[in-house]
Design a protein with these regions (language model features):
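Nucleotide-sugar donor-binding catalytic core of glycosyltransferases
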Residues: 1-24, 28-30, 34-47, 51, ...
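Short, contiguous hydrophobic alpha-helices characteristic of membrane insertion segments
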Residues: 188, 236, 254-260, 301-308
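Conserved acidic donor-binding segment of nucleotide-sugar-dependent glycosyltransferases
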Residues: 256-262, 272-276
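A charged, aromatic-enriched C-terminal amphipathic alpha-helix characteristic of glycosyltransferases
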Residues: 274-307
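Hydrophobic, well-ordered secondary-structure elements that form the walls
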Residues: 229, 256, 286
Protein backbone atom coordinates (compact mmCIF):
# COMPACT_ATOMS: atom_id res chain seq x y z
CA UNK A 1 0.00 0.00 0.00
CA UNK A 2 1.22 3.51 -0.80
CA UNK A 3 1.41 5.66 2.35
CA UNK A 4 0.73 9.41 2.25
CA UNK A 5 1.29 11.10 5.62
CA UNK A 6 1.15 14.79 6.48
CA UNK A 7 0.99 16.24 10.00
CA UNK A 8 0.93 20.01 9.45
CA UNK A 9 -1.53 21.85 11.68
CA UNK A 10 -1.60 19.03 14.25
CA UNK A 11 -0.04 18.64 17.68
CA UNK A 12 3.38 17.20 16.96
CA UNK A 13 4.13 15.25 20.14
CA UNK A 14 0.99 13.16 20.46
CA UNK A 15 0.36 9.42 20.34
CA UNK A 16 -0.64 9.62 16.66
CA UNK A 17 2.64 11.36 15.83
CA UNK A 18 4.52 8.08 16.17
CA UNK A 19 2.67 5.61 13.96
CA UNK A 20 5.43 5.62 11.35
CA UNK A 21 3.13 4.07 8.76
CA UNK A 22 5.64 5.15 6.14
CA UNK A 23 7.61 2.02 6.99
CA UNK A 24 4.90 -0.03 5.26
CA UNK A 25 4.99 1.95 2.01
CA UNK A 26 5.44 -0.54 -0.84
CA UNK A 27 4.78 2.00 -3.64
CA UNK A 28 1.57 0.29 -4.63
CA UNK A 29 -0.09 1.71 -7.72
CA UNK A 30 -3.59 0.60 -6.73
CA UNK A 31 -3.91 1.09 -2.94
CA UNK A 32 -3.15 4.22 -0.90
CA UNK A 33 -3.55 5.19 2.75
CA UNK A 34 -3.84 8.83 3.83
CA UNK A 35 -2.89 9.77 7.39
CA UNK A 36 -3.20 13.24 8.90
CA UNK A 37 -6.18 15.59 8.62
CA UNK A 38 -4.41 17.86 6.13
CA UNK A 39 -4.23 14.98 3.64
CA UNK A 40 -8.02 14.66 3.64
CA UNK A 41 -8.44 18.26 2.46
CA UNK A 42 -5.49 18.34 0.05
CA UNK A 43 -7.04 18.46 -3.41
CA UNK A 44 -3.67 18.07 -5.11
CA UNK A 45 -3.05 14.78 -3.33
CA UNK A 46 -6.57 13.60 -3.99
CA UNK A 47 -6.21 14.30 -7.69
CA UNK A 48 -2.93 12.40 -7.77
CA UNK A 49 -4.42 9.23 -6.28
CA UNK A 50 -8.01 9.41 -7.53
CA UNK A 51 -7.61 6.41 -9.84
CA UNK A 52 -6.31 4.10 -7.10
CA UNK A 53 -8.81 1.30 -6.55
CA UNK A 54 -8.49 1.43 -2.75
CA UNK A 55 -8.18 4.82 -1.03
CA UNK A 56 -8.06 4.65 2.77
CA UNK A 57 -8.14 7.41 5.38
CA UNK A 58 -7.54 7.15 9.15
CA UNK A 59 -9.92 9.69 10.69
CA UNK A 60 -8.93 10.69 14.23
CA UNK A 61 -10.83 13.99 14.29
CA UNK A 62 -14.49 12.86 14.19
CA UNK A 63 -16.90 14.01 15.43
CA UNK A 64 -15.16 17.23 16.51
CA UNK A 65 -14.42 18.36 12.96
CA UNK A 66 -18.15 18.85 12.40
CA UNK A 67 -18.01 21.85 14.74
CA UNK A 68 -15.62 23.84 12.56
CA UNK A 69 -16.25 23.00 8.89
CA UNK A 70 -19.12 22.24 6.55
CA UNK A 71 -17.12 19.94 4.29
CA UNK A 72 -16.40 16.90 6.49
CA UNK A 73 -18.65 14.49 4.64
CA UNK A 74 -17.52 15.68 1.22
CA UNK A 75 -13.90 15.17 2.28
CA UNK A 76 -14.59 11.62 3.47
CA UNK A 77 -16.50 10.37 0.45
CA UNK A 78 -13.40 10.68 -1.73
CA UNK A 79 -12.12 7.57 0.04
CA UNK A 80 -13.25 3.99 -0.47
CA UNK A 81 -12.60 3.15 3.20
CA UNK A 82 -12.41 5.34 6.31
CA UNK A 83 -11.28 4.05 9.71
CA UNK A 84 -12.67 6.41 12.33
CA UNK A 85 -12.71 6.78 16.11
CA UNK A 86 -16.38 7.85 15.97
CA UNK A 87 -18.67 4.80 15.61
CA UNK A 88 -21.74 7.06 15.43
CA UNK A 89 -20.47 9.01 12.43
CA UNK A 90 -19.43 5.68 10.89
CA UNK A 91 -22.96 4.29 11.19
CA UNK A 92 -24.50 7.49 9.85
CA UNK A 93 -22.24 7.70 6.82
CA UNK A 94 -22.42 3.97 6.08
CA UNK A 95 -26.15 4.52 5.61
CA UNK A 96 -25.83 7.60 3.40
CA UNK A 97 -22.63 7.22 1.34
CA UNK A 98 -20.82 4.62 -0.75
CA UNK A 99 -17.71 4.84 1.42
CA UNK A 100 -17.12 2.04 3.93
CA UNK A 101 -16.64 3.42 7.44
CA UNK A 102 -15.06 1.20 10.10
CA UNK A 103 -14.94 2.22 13.80
CA UNK A 104 -11.59 1.90 15.57
CA UNK A 105 -10.28 3.06 18.96
CA UNK A 106 -7.34 5.44 19.02
CA UNK A 107 -4.37 3.42 17.68
CA UNK A 108 -0.93 3.57 19.29
CA UNK A 109 2.61 2.44 18.54
CA UNK A 110 4.07 0.02 21.07
CA UNK A 111 7.48 1.62 20.50
CA UNK A 112 6.22 4.64 22.42
CA UNK A 113 6.07 2.55 25.57
CA UNK A 114 9.13 0.33 25.20
CA UNK A 115 11.02 2.24 27.92
CA UNK A 116 8.26 1.94 30.51
CA UNK A 117 9.37 0.15 33.68
CA UNK A 118 6.28 -1.81 34.64
CA UNK A 119 7.91 -2.91 37.88
CA UNK A 120 8.42 0.64 39.12
CA UNK A 121 6.47 1.54 42.27
CA UNK A 122 3.32 3.63 41.97
CA UNK A 123 4.56 6.98 43.28
CA UNK A 124 1.35 8.90 42.51
CA UNK A 125 -2.28 8.22 43.29
CA UNK A 126 -4.15 9.80 40.41
CA UNK A 127 -3.60 11.64 37.12
CA UNK A 128 -5.76 13.73 34.82
CA UNK A 129 -4.56 14.64 31.32
CA UNK A 130 -6.12 17.47 29.37
CA UNK A 131 -7.39 21.03 29.34
CA UNK A 132 -9.90 22.27 31.90
CA UNK A 133 -12.90 23.15 29.74
CA UNK A 134 -15.95 22.87 32.00
CA UNK A 135 -17.06 22.91 35.63
CA UNK A 136 -16.88 19.12 35.84
CA UNK A 137 -13.18 19.21 34.94
CA UNK A 138 -12.57 21.65 37.80
CA UNK A 139 -14.48 19.39 40.18
CA UNK A 140 -12.23 16.49 39.17
CA UNK A 141 -9.15 18.50 40.09
CA UNK A 142 -10.73 19.49 43.42
CA UNK A 143 -11.08 15.80 44.30
CA UNK A 144 -7.59 14.93 43.08
CA UNK A 145 -6.04 17.55 45.34
CA UNK A 146 -6.76 15.25 48.29
CA UNK A 147 -4.17 12.84 46.88
CA UNK A 148 -0.69 12.80 45.45
CA UNK A 149 -1.82 13.85 42.00
CA UNK A 150 -0.66 14.90 38.55
CA UNK A 151 -2.51 17.19 36.17
CA UNK A 152 -0.81 17.34 32.79
CA UNK A 153 -1.99 19.92 30.26
CA UNK A 154 -0.65 21.51 27.08
CA UNK A 155 -1.33 24.97 28.49
CA UNK A 156 -1.47 26.65 31.92
CA UNK A 157 -4.67 27.56 33.75
CA UNK A 158 -5.60 30.14 36.35
CA UNK A 159 -5.03 29.48 40.02
CA UNK A 160 -5.99 27.49 41.99
CA UNK A 161 -6.15 25.06 39.06
CA UNK A 162 -2.68 25.49 37.61
CA UNK A 163 -1.59 22.08 36.22
CA UNK A 164 1.28 20.37 37.97
CA UNK A 165 2.88 19.73 34.56
CA UNK A 166 2.52 21.99 31.51
CA UNK A 167 3.45 21.05 27.94
CA UNK A 168 5.70 18.15 28.90
CA UNK A 169 6.79 15.78 26.16
CA UNK A 170 4.87 12.55 25.76
CA UNK A 171 7.73 10.37 26.96
CA UNK A 172 7.78 12.17 30.30
CA UNK A 173 3.98 12.02 30.50
CA UNK A 174 3.90 8.28 29.87
CA UNK A 175 6.61 7.70 32.48
CA UNK A 176 4.58 9.64 35.06
CA UNK A 177 1.44 7.79 34.04
CA UNK A 178 3.11 4.43 34.54
CA UNK A 179 3.98 5.48 38.10
CA UNK A 180 0.37 6.43 38.87
CA UNK A 181 -2.39 4.20 40.23
CA UNK A 182 -5.45 5.79 38.60
CA UNK A 183 -6.20 7.81 35.47
CA UNK A 184 -9.46 9.79 35.32
CA UNK A 185 -11.05 10.24 31.90
CA UNK A 186 -14.15 11.64 30.22
CA UNK A 187 -14.76 10.48 26.65
CA UNK A 188 -16.60 13.73 25.97
CA UNK A 189 -15.86 16.94 24.08
CA UNK A 190 -17.50 20.10 25.47
CA UNK A 191 -19.54 22.09 22.94
CA UNK A 192 -19.06 25.82 22.54
CA UNK A 193 -22.12 28.03 21.86
CA UNK A 194 -21.43 28.15 18.11
CA UNK A 195 -20.86 24.43 17.62
CA UNK A 196 -24.50 23.26 17.33
CA UNK A 197 -25.13 25.71 14.49
CA UNK A 198 -22.19 24.28 12.54
CA UNK A 199 -23.33 20.71 13.17
CA UNK A 200 -26.91 21.44 12.15
CA UNK A 201 -25.63 22.73 8.82
CA UNK A 202 -25.21 19.11 7.70
CA UNK A 203 -28.12 17.40 5.98
CA UNK A 204 -29.47 14.63 8.18
CA UNK A 205 -27.27 15.60 11.13
CA UNK A 206 -29.96 14.45 13.56
CA UNK A 207 -29.42 10.85 12.39
CA UNK A 208 -25.89 10.90 13.77
CA UNK A 209 -26.16 9.67 17.36
CA UNK A 210 -23.09 11.69 18.31
CA UNK A 211 -25.34 14.76 18.15
CA UNK A 212 -28.39 13.32 19.91
CA UNK A 213 -27.94 15.31 23.11
CA UNK A 214 -26.22 18.57 22.31
CA UNK A 215 -28.33 20.15 25.03
CA UNK A 216 -26.06 18.41 27.55
CA UNK A 217 -23.19 20.59 26.34
CA UNK A 218 -21.18 17.55 25.21
CA UNK A 219 -20.65 15.17 22.34
CA UNK A 220 -18.75 11.86 22.50
CA UNK A 221 -15.04 11.77 21.71
CA UNK A 222 -12.90 8.71 22.37
CA UNK A 223 -9.73 9.94 24.08
CA UNK A 224 -6.21 8.66 23.43
CA UNK A 225 -5.50 9.07 27.16
CA UNK A 226 -7.59 5.93 27.75
CA UNK A 227 -5.28 3.93 25.50
CA UNK A 228 -2.18 5.55 26.98
CA UNK A 229 -3.30 4.69 30.51
CA UNK A 230 -3.99 1.07 29.67
CA UNK A 231 -0.59 0.76 28.00
CA UNK A 232 1.04 2.22 31.11
CA UNK A 233 -0.82 -0.23 33.38
CA UNK A 234 -2.78 2.52 35.08
CA UNK A 235 -6.36 1.83 36.15
CA UNK A 236 -8.82 3.88 34.09
CA UNK A 237 -11.82 5.56 35.75
CA UNK A 238 -14.18 6.67 32.96
CA UNK A 239 -17.19 8.98 33.25
CA UNK A 240 -20.48 7.21 32.45
CA UNK A 241 -22.32 9.30 29.86
CA UNK A 242 -25.08 9.26 27.24
CA UNK A 243 -22.92 7.33 24.75
CA UNK A 244 -20.25 5.29 26.57
CA UNK A 245 -18.24 5.06 23.36
CA UNK A 246 -15.54 3.06 25.15
CA UNK A 247 -17.83 0.00 25.22
CA UNK A 248 -17.31 -0.46 21.50
CA UNK A 249 -13.88 -1.88 22.35
CA UNK A 250 -13.60 -2.44 26.11
CA UNK A 251 -15.82 -3.90 28.85
CA UNK A 252 -16.72 -2.11 32.10
CA UNK A 253 -15.44 -3.76 35.29
CA UNK A 254 -13.18 -5.93 33.15
CA UNK A 255 -10.96 -3.33 31.46
CA UNK A 256 -12.01 -0.09 33.21
CA UNK A 257 -14.38 1.26 35.87
CA UNK A 258 -17.16 3.82 35.44
CA UNK A 259 -17.80 6.79 37.67
CA UNK A 260 -21.34 8.19 37.54
CA UNK A 261 -21.11 11.53 39.29
CA UNK A 262 -18.59 13.71 41.07
CA UNK A 263 -19.76 12.23 44.38
CA UNK A 264 -19.33 8.71 43.01
CA UNK A 265 -15.85 9.61 41.76
CA UNK A 266 -14.96 10.88 45.24
CA UNK A 267 -15.81 7.56 46.90
CA UNK A 268 -14.48 5.28 44.16
CA UNK A 269 -11.15 7.04 43.97
CA UNK A 270 -10.74 6.76 47.74
CA UNK A 271 -11.45 3.03 47.68
CA UNK A 272 -9.19 2.31 44.71
CA UNK A 273 -6.23 4.29 45.98
CA UNK A 274 -6.42 2.54 49.33
CA UNK A 275 -7.08 -0.94 47.92
CA UNK A 276 -5.15 -0.77 44.68
CA UNK A 277 -3.91 -4.36 44.59
CA UNK A 278 -7.47 -5.68 44.52
CA UNK A 279 -7.93 -3.94 41.16
CA UNK A 280 -4.81 -5.35 39.57
CA UNK A 281 -6.79 -7.90 37.52
CA UNK A 282 -8.53 -5.03 35.70
CA UNK A 283 -5.22 -3.32 34.98
CA UNK A 284 -3.74 -6.51 33.55
CA UNK A 285 -6.83 -7.35 31.49
CA UNK A 286 -6.85 -3.86 30.00
CA UNK A 287 -3.16 -4.07 29.16
CA UNK A 288 -3.73 -7.37 27.36
CA UNK A 289 -6.81 -6.14 25.48
CA UNK A 290 -5.30 -2.86 24.33
CA UNK A 291 -2.61 -4.73 22.39
CA UNK A 292 -5.29 -5.49 19.78
CA UNK A 293 -5.27 -1.83 18.81
CA UNK A 294 -1.57 -1.36 18.22
CA UNK A 295 -1.03 0.44 14.91
CA UNK A 296 0.52 -2.59 13.19
CA UNK A 297 -2.58 -4.64 14.01
CA UNK A 298 -4.82 -1.83 12.78
CA UNK A 299 -2.80 -1.56 9.58
CA UNK A 300 -3.09 -5.31 8.95
CA UNK A 301 -6.86 -5.04 9.38
CA UNK A 302 -6.87 -2.27 6.78
CA UNK A 303 -4.80 -4.37 4.38
CA UNK A 304 -7.18 -7.30 4.74
CA UNK A 305 -10.39 -5.21 4.66
CA UNK A 306 -11.32 -6.39 8.15
CA UNK A 307 -13.29 -4.77 10.93
CA UNK A 308 -12.21 -4.77 14.56
Amino acid sequence: MKIVAEYSGEYQDMINSYYNLEQYDDNSTSEVLFQGYSTSINNELKEKYKDFKKRVYINLEAPCAYTSTQTCNDEQTYFTDVYTICPYSAKWLNETTNTKFVPIPFPFSKKCFENINYNAPKEYDVMYMGHLMCAEHLAIIDIMKNYKYIHSSLSPFREPYMPTHVNINSGVKWDLLSKTKVSIAMNLAPLNPGHPESIMGYDGWEKNEAFKNMGSGYMPQFKPRVIESMMCKTLVLVKYDDWNVIENWFEPNKHFIYWYSIEDLFYKLYHIVNNYKSYNHIVEAAFEKVQDYEITNIYNKILNNESL
